[in-house]
């Protein structure tokens, strides 16, 4: 599987993670994208954006048999791409906040 950032994803590793762990990792990369966008560092924002897209793509592969999850991941990916390309920081913040619940939940249950 080719990736946008050039890194080779380990689909086997990602498929062993719980859904909460997967989403928490995605949240981290989206948070980095938002952070660099807010600091007007387009180069770093774009790198984080590409890494987030790679994570989205791996998660989509991991969830191809779970239609509802797959559909929501695809919608979220589309929304994330659109918000990034339009520099819609408000919507990127909403996406970041929505995904933060997975990271917080994961911390509580570990």
Residue spans for each PLM region:
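Surface-exposed peri-terminal alpha-helical interaction modules
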Residues: 1-110
